[in-house]
A protein has these predicted regions:
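Domain-length accessory/inserted modules outside core catalytic folds
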Residues: 1-35, 41-117
Length: 117
């Protein structure tokens, strides 16, 4: 599943013309959408619209975060964000670890000049 999901995340950035961002969910700046992998994936799958103001909320009311937690599980989702953001693996839960590994892989591919760890 991780390889397919990584490919889908990369495709989401490419087809939607997104720029990756860390430690935030979404920032619209000068006609460019800077988004985290969860927002990229949620928009790519048609779950949320890129104009939805809730995807810019850094917290629990973020529509993309809520969707990802329901779809992939909360631990996996947190792990993915931590890995992408360059955070050290904080838990040993298998779902968290899988998400963290995917986040690191996504950051390595999408941000080659700024490796996550």
């Amino acid at each position: 599943m991780k390889n397919e999901l990584l490919a889908e995340i990369v495709a989401a950035y490419q087809t939607q013309n997104f720029k990756p961002i860390r430690r935030m969910f979404c920032v619209h700046e000068k006609g460019v959408d800077h988004v985290c992998p969860l927002v990229a994936l949620a928009i790519h799958r048609g779950v949320v619209d890129r104009a939805d103001p809730s995807i810019e909320i850094d917290g629990g009311a973020n529509a993309a975060l809520d969707w990802a937690a329901k779809t992939f599980g909360e631990e996996f989702t947190i792990g993915l964000l931590d890995g992408f953001d360059g955070q050290v693996q904080a838990k040993t839960d298998p779902d968290y670890v899988d998400g963290h590994e995917l986040g690191v892989a996504a950051a390595t591919q999408l941000l080659p000049r700024d490796p996550p760890i």
